[in-house]
């Protein structure tokens, strides 16, 4: 199976979350902890995607194929690119294959609250800035404080042209 076939499926497992507040394209969500694979590098996002894709395609200690999931997390910070794949919920830190590539970190994320704004099309820096501003304005209006940097997530294969789903997200201080 080629890369395009593996990332063109619409039947991916999606990371679980609970919607706390929903208003138009804005949501506050609670995300329970999940297992993730992360690459931090000064390479472009395509290089990071390739490393993570190779890991789930069998470049790991068990030579095991791991199913693709959604979303893919992406952040640019101080000339570094960070990309994370969520691992299928059937895996634990103890059961998942270890990457052969030392630049890939497998970790268990903490349960947290996030605010997001959803948008369509292909994401780019202009759309990220526009929707980031919109998200920060909405959080300010609701008097909700942020924690950490903004980042974006993508739910679709690059080969999907229509009805794409992207989101700008940020961790928030929230008590349910």
Feature names for model-found ranges:
Residues 4-176:
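A solvent-exposed interaction/effector surface
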């Amino acid at each position: 199976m080629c890369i395009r076939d593996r990332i063109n499926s619409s039947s991916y497992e999606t990371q679980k979350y609970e919607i706390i507040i929903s208003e138009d394209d804005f949501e506050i969500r609670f995300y329970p902890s999940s297992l993730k694979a992360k690459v931090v590098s000064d390479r472009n996002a395509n290089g990071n995607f390739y490393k993570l894709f190779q890991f789930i395609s069998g470049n790991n200690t068990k030579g095991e194929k791991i199913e693709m999931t959604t979303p893919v997390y992406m952040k640019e910070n101080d000339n570094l690119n960070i990309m994370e794949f969520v691992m299928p919920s059937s895996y634990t830190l103890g059961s998942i294959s270890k990457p052969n590539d030392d630049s890939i970190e497998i970790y268990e994320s903490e349960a947290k609250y996030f605010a997001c704004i959803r948008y369509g099309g292909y994401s780019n820096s202009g759309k990220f800035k526009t929707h980031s501003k919109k998200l920060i304005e909405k959080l300010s209006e609701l008097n909700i404080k942020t924690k950490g940097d903004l980042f974006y997530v993508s739910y679709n294969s690059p080969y999907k042209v229509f009805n794409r789903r992207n989101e700008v997200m940020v961790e928030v201080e929230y008590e349910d």
